[in-house]
Every structure is written in C-alpha cells, then in structure tokens.
C-alpha cells in the first residue's frame, strides 16, 4: 500500500512523505524539502529515506535540505539519491560543498544527483571523502522506463511549466493478484502452499496429494487488482493546453496531490506566475479520473476564511477534494 502525508503548515513550505509498503519491504520517498517540513517527521524516518525528489529548486522547496543532509551526510547503510530537473546538480552540489569538510578524508559516503529532462536522466556522483568537490559525470541514460523501480514501487516524472524546468511525479504500486475466497468455497478447496505456486505461474499444482492443471484453477480463483497510485504536482501553469496534455498522463492515478496557490478569482495572477487555482486543480482531477484530490501549497495572501471558499470552489467541480489533514479547524 501507499501511505502519504503532507508535511508543513498551510501557507508555509510543504513537502510530501510517501511510504510504499508491500508487506515484504518498504520504499520511502521525500518529495520536495521546504523549510521546517521535516519538523514533524521522526528522525528514523528521515534517515530511512531512499530518494529525495525535487519538483524544482526554488527556495520554498529546498530550504529544509540542510536538515535532511545533516542526519544523512555520511550515510553508508543505503544509497543516497537526489532527483530534480535540469540544473539541479549545479545547485545541489553547492549545498553539498557548503560546509567545512576538514574530516572528509575519513568519511566514505557517496551521493548521486540525477537531472531529469524529457529524453534522459543525467547522473553525477559526488564523494564525501573528496569533500564533494568533484562532479563525476556518470552519463545520460535514455528515459525508456521509470525513473525508480523497486519491488514495491515505480516512479515516473511529468514535465511541468513554471517559467523554467519543473517536474511532477507519478508513483504506482505493482498490481496485486488476490485469491477469491468465494472461488475456494465453490470448488471446495482449502488454502495451502499450492496457492503460492498458482500465483507464481506453475503449470500444475499439488492439492491434497493430487496433481491438477493450474490454468482452470487460475481462471476460477485469481483476481488481478491494480496497485495504489498517487501523483504530486506543484508550482505549474495549468491552462487549457496543459489540462489537455496532463490529464491523459495522470489517467488512472488514484490520488492527486496538487498545489492550491490561488483562488479562482485570481486566475490571471496564477497564469502570470505559472501557478494554479483550486478550480483548475479540481478540473484536472476530474478529467484525469482521480478518486481523490488533496490540495496543498497555499499562498500567504489568503486567510483561513478564504481557504474554505477556495475548497468549496474545488469541491463544486470535484467533490472529493480536500486540504491536508487538520489544515482547517474543525476538520
């Protein structure tokens, strides 16, 4: 399953914390890292982050990076990966280098920064024992598949327009194969190790000492179920052309986490600054066929009474729209 939590407060910096849990293992992702967004995340979770993915490198999306880096800078228990749009390596390299690394020769952590464009992923490696001073170019890898793929999760990037390069991220769990209990009852069968063999694609399975062909049992008993999914899109232009482009890319995604920077009345200002309104976000959720819309990244220009109006405007188009948990008093 995918569990996600919006970090940070309304009208302040936000981030998204996601855990993919297959029951056999976990993958943890941090999407953006604004100022103080890690304050409510337990230290052991920050230290267990597998990937930090930036939408872009404006200050309100990276201001909390020092907090993340401070507890992970010499991490060798797992790989250290940072992701972002073109230009991310140059900016993030300065963040890595921006300390007095007088003990660096005794330290051994490796960090990789991946820049994602439409065609490829360009990766640079940085070594702590070199005080991160050398950007080792590991080349470009064509984007022929997901950015990240683990047994629990796959991550893809969606290019966005924010007066410069910006990325949205789509996270999908693998599909699941479940056993139909009614089918077991109908066939008068008892669960056992043979079900694992059936799921694994065996041609025959042994049930109560009898060898039986697997194909008819598979048709009667196994049901495929799509895995959970979510998308995170923030700081982007959402005009009619972008709605038409993005909706098919997000088709089938269960939950959309979208910025809610502007009220509908300020649509012109949103377009000028390459941000969205709550109505536009709701329209995208409806066109993409999402089941839920979570709005975040509110502008400081609005007060709580305005937030309620902004949410009502979104719900008029997409009833399953909401803000992050407890952002509105009484919710």
UniProtKB/Swiss-Prot annotation:
Keywords: Endonuclease, Hydrolase, Metal-binding, Nuclease, tRNA processing, Zinc. Its EC number is 3.1.26.11. It is an enzyme of class 3 (hydrolase). The keyword NADP does not apply. Its cofactor is Zn(2+). It comes from the Bacteria. SUPFAM superfamilies: Metallo-hydrolase/oxidoreductase. The active site is at 60 (proton acceptor). It catalyses: Endonucleolytic cleavage of RNA, removing extra 3' nucleotides from tRNA precursor, generating 3' termini of tRNAs. A 3'-hydroxy group is left at the tRNA terminus and a 5'-phosphoryl group is left at the trailer molecule. Zn(2+) 1 binds at residues 56, 58, 162, 235. The keyword tRNA processing applies. GO terms for molecular function: 3'-tRNA processing endoribonuclease activity; metal ion binding. Zn(2+) 2 binds at residues 60-61, 235, 297. Binds 2 Zn(2+) ions. Homodimer. Zinc phosphodiesterase, which displays some tRNA 3'-processing endonuclease activity. Probably involved in tRNA maturation, by removing a 3'-trailer from precursor tRNA. Belongs to the RNase Z family. PANTHER family: ZINC PHOSPHODIESTERASE ELAC PROTEIN 1. This is Ribonuclease Z. It comes from Deinococcus radiodurans (strain ATCC 13939 / DSM 20539 / JCM 16871 / CCUG 27074 / LMG 4051 / NBRC 15346 / NCIMB 9279 / VKM B-1422 / R1).
């Amino acid at each position: 399953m995918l569990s996600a939590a919006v970090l940070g407060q309304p009208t302040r910096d936000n981030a998204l914390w996601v855990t993919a849990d297959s029951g056999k293992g976990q993958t943890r992702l941090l999407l953006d890292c604004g100022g103080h967004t890690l304050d409510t995340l337990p230290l052991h979770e920050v230290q267990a982050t597998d990937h930090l993915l930036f939408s872009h490198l404006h200050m309100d999306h990276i201001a909390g990076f020092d907090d993340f880096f401070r507890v992970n800078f010499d991490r060798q228990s797992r790989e250290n990966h940072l992701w972002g749009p073109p230009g991310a390596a140059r900016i993030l390299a300065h963040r890595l280098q921006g300390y007095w690394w007088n003990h660096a020769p005794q330290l051994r952590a490796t960090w990789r920064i991946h820049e994602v464009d439409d065609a490829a992923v360009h990766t640079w490696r940085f070594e702590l024992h070199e005080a991160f001073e050398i950007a080792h170019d590991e080349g470009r890898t064509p984007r022929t598949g997901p950015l990240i793929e683990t047994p629990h999760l796959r991550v893809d990037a969606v290019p966005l327009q924010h007066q410069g390069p910006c990325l949205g991220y789509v996270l999908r769990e693998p599909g699941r194969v479940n056993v139909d209990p009614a089918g077991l009852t109908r066939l008068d069968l008892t669960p056992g190790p043979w079900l694992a063999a059936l799921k694994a694609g065996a041609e025959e399975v042994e049930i109560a000492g009898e060898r039986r062909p697997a194909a008819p049992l598979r048709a009667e008993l196994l049901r495929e179920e799509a895995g959970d999914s979510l998308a995170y899109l923030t700081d982007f232009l959402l005009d009619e052309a972008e709605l038409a482009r993005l909706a098919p890319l997000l088709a089938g995604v269960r939950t959309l986490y979208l910025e809610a920077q502007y009220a509908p009345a300020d649509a012109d200002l949103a377009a000028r600054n390459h941000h969205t309104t709550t109505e536009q976000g709701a329209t995208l959720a409806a066109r993409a066929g999402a089941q839920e819309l979570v709005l975040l990244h509110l502008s400081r220009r609005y007060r709580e009474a305005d937030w309620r109006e902004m949410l009502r405007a979104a719900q008029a188009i997409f009833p399953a729209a909401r803000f992050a948990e407890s952002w509105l008093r009484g919710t």
